[in-house]
Regions:
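Donor-nucleotide binding loops and adjacent catalytic segments primarily
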Residues: 68, 75-159, 192-196, 200, ...
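Short Ser/Thr-rich beta->loop micro-motif in glycosyltransferases that lines
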Residues: 163-166, 182-186
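Structural loop-to-beta junction motif characteristic of Rossmann-like glycosyltransferase folds
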Residues: 9-11, 158-159, 175-183, 203
């Protein structure tokens, strides 16, 4: 902001959440144009400066092929597919809730689960015990999905369970129904507000983290 003022360069900012952080609230006073991802964020800035622009999506996670994606993820059945993702680092509460109903889920669905790299070993071990006499071939766990893996994940998933970060816009770009579980202690409570604004459009169901238990999911 200071550099733009000194050099007399027009300032453009982008707000990716439904509620702006302190920096963008401050910068908004000096910005010439302000792009927002959620309509709710517009009320925090001068109306004449604001444009609803969404969030840019990486092209490399779009445009998959379902047959190739199923092969890459080792999915060979014809059941509906639930995709579970907690961001690049995973989400412990979502992992625990998924494992809590994993036996029941895999009786009716294939489950593709990004656990987070740090959680992968523990989740995989617990899933192995849970599914010892179940449908272990229907559970597909990954510590981390790169861009091609994410493309396959979104391509095959019939329902997505996720946090409510910028991944909302990836889910929206694919047109997938979702269950969003906002991170409870996110800054400015932005994930919860993101989730409810998205839900107001009829695009998802929101489960708040304190209400999350295995059997709420199934």
């Amino acid at each position: 902001v200071v550099a733009a003022a000194i050099l007399r360069i027009p300032l453009v900012i982008h707000e990716s959440d439904a509620v702006p952080g302190k920096v963008n609230k401050f910068a908004g006073h000096f910005a010439k144009r302000i792009g927002v991802a959620f309509t709710g964020a517009a009320s925090f800035f001068p109306e004449k400066k604001v444009a609803l622009v969404g969030i840019p999506i990486r092209k490399r996670i779009l445009g998959g092929n379902r047959d190739i994606a199923r092969e890459n993820l080792q999915i060979f059945g014809n059941l509906p597919i639930i995709g579970v993702i907690g961001g690049s680092q995973g989400a412990g509460r979502i992992n625990d809730a998924t494992l809590g109903v994993l036996k029941e889920l895999t009786e009716h669905y294939e489950v593709v689960h990004q656990t987070g790299t740090a959680n992968f070993h523990d989740v995989e071990q617990e899933a192995t015990v849970i599914l010892e006499f179940g449908h272990k071939e229907r559970y597909h766990a990954f510590g981390f999905l790169d861009e091609s893996g994410l493309r396959d994940f979104y391509e095959v998933s019939d329902l997505i369970i996720s946090r409510a970060s910028s991944s909302i816009f990836e889910i929206a770009a694919w047109g997938k129904p979702s269950i969003l579980i906002p991170l409870q202690n996110a800054a400015q409570d932005h994930q919860r507000k993101n989730a409810y604004e998205y839900a107001a459009a009829g695009a998802c169901i929101v489960i708040e983290e304190p209400n999350l238990s295995p059997h709420v999911l199934f």
